Amino acid sequence: MPGIVLIGAQWGDEGKGKATDLIGTKVDYVARFNGGNNAGHSVVVGDESYALHLLPSGIINPNLTPVIGNGVVVDPEVLFEEIDGLESRGIDCSHLKVSEAAHIIAPYHRTLDKVTERFLGKHKIGTTGRGIGPAYADKINRVGIRVHDLFNADHLHDKVEASLHQKNQMLVKLYNRRPIDVDQTTEELLKLGERLKPYVANTGLILNKALDEGKTVLFEGAQATMLDVDHGTYPFVTSSNPTAGGACTGTGVGPTKITRVIGVSKAYVTRVGEGPFPTELLDESGEWLRQQGHEFGVTTGRPRRCGWFDAVVNRYASQVNGLTDIVLTKLDVLTGLKEIPICVAYDVDGERHDDMPTDQAAFAAAKPIYETMPGWDEDISDCHSFDELPATCQAYVKRLEELSGCRISAIGTGPQRDHVIQINSLVD
């Protein structure tokens, strides 16, 4: 009954897609449990690269069942674009299962997301504009539309009417926009529902039955710990729970069925959008990391903010998620540096903090306290065991492990699928 949770331990873009694909060859199901198509990730198989936003990374593997859980907000138009794109390249998506209880991102959610960000001006959150936040807001306000609502015209019309009642008032009176037509929106959603229906299932039942039968389920988180709406750098966060606890609420599987929690961390740190970032590099070092690591968003194309490894963040992620293992990615990007700084603590108003401040004002004021490790020049992409790595590279990894408080069980040494060193098994 192995239930394995895979989450990001930083601010996202850690390489979870590659880690999922690595583990996915040994599991029976891969289930996404949070977020929406704001979560871009790339999977490289041989010479082929697949950019995914909504589909689980495991969709590439024909021998497992990919699942979109109830905690995900689903934009049907984006889902069909991804399915069509993969099938045009010979990838069969017919085995996909979508939770009947997942909430839908409707066209008006995207509209609201964009106009709200413009209205907020300098106070904007820095969303992707894809309707994620408004869809989750509707879920909490109990006016959301779920997948199973798309199959009954009268019921759906009532749901759309209820959802748009307040939104149209806001659009007209606050944002000076035209109201959204209820009938037209209902018709659009009904058509989307017709195509979605073959994929729809009671995914909670499917996953629990699989675990009871001794099959292995990988729970794939989108975004990351520091973007969690409860545990991240609020308010500069996503609208869901990308932490390990979200795997349970986002799929309908109980916590006693989770046997392992794996966090993915880059060998440095990146962030997209607004919000505090203590180790951010605004100089040529940051630009060097950005270019060497190809740090541009899969979803938005935006350049990512780059900084040195933050051990305080990783310790916090280990604590919040109960990490059992860390997958360290993009270690190869650091090749060529003479010295590599590691943030081991923060200076907040002259006082040392070894742990994450809960006060976001304090976190925004935090200055990194660094220790420096020697770098290496050797190409590590052909290394297949930890002992083959340069001695200074090994020392860097061991220090990150010590500071994070969790063992590093796999290391990414390059962009290809086989550019990885496995130290400990990730699947029991």
Swiss-Prot record:
GO molecular function term, any single one: adenylosuccinate synthase activity
TM spans (from-to): none
EC number: 6.3.4.4
Binding site for substrate: 298-304
InterPro entries reported for this sequence: Adenylosuccin_syn_GTP-bd (IPR018220), Adenylosuccin_syn_Lys_AS (IPR033128), Adenylosuccinate_synth_dom1 (IPR042109), Adenylosuccinate_synth_dom2 (IPR042110), Adenylosuccinate_synth_dom3 (IPR042111), Adenylosuccinate_synthetase (IPR001114), P-loop_NTPase (IPR027417)
Protein name: Adenylosuccinate synthetase
Subunit structure: Homodimer.
Organism expressing this protein natively: Bifidobacterium longum (strain DJO10A)
UniProtKB keywords: Cytoplasm, GTP-binding, Ligase, Magnesium, Metal-binding, Nucleotide-binding, Purine biosynthesis
Catalytic activity field: IMP + L-aspartate + GTP = N(6)-(1,2-dicarboxyethyl)-AMP + GDP + phosphate + 2 H(+)
Any one annotated GO CC term: cytoplasm
Binding site for IMP: 13-16, 38-41, 128, 142, 223, 238, 302
Family in the record: Belongs to the adenylosuccinate synthetase family.
